[in-house]
């Protein structure tokens, strides 16, 4: 931990102060809630996927943005990456235990949102 990390004692354990700009947990939150990070986590909740499967599932994401999002989530320990030594290489991604813990409430949140929205095409007046 660097000198800028802020810990606040809570009970017997120390917790990160996510309101401090140097807090490493803040970076993880930024990656999870980024435009594409949240969709990657939600997509991987259903099981391991290859890069092209993720790209097809997440409509509108470019290869560049998918690569950047995956790199950040792998670096945060939320997603694992496995490369098969084939030609071309097959790269598979899945959620770590940490990633599943973070992804479950996101799925619940999306479920709550979609249950409360009016059906598509319904009069919004």
What do the PLM-derived regions correspond to, one by one?
Residues 1-14, 20:
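Long, low-complexity, charged/polar intrinsically disordered regions in eukaryotic proteins
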Residues 19-65, 92, 123:
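N-terminal helix-turn-helix DNA-binding core of bacterial DNA-binding proteins
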Residues 38, 76, 102-120:
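Alpha-helical linker/hinge and terminal dimerization helices associated
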Residues 50, 70, 114-117:
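Short, basic amphipathic alpha-helical segments that act as recognition/interaction helices
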Residues 64, 81-83, 89:
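Catalytic cores of DNA base-excision repair glycosylases
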Residues 66, 70-73:
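Basic amphipathic alpha-helical segments that dock to polyanions
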Residues 74-84:
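A short, conserved structural fragment
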Residues 85-106:
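Basic, amphipathic "hinge/linker" alpha-helix immediately C-terminal to the N-terminal HTH DNA-binding motif
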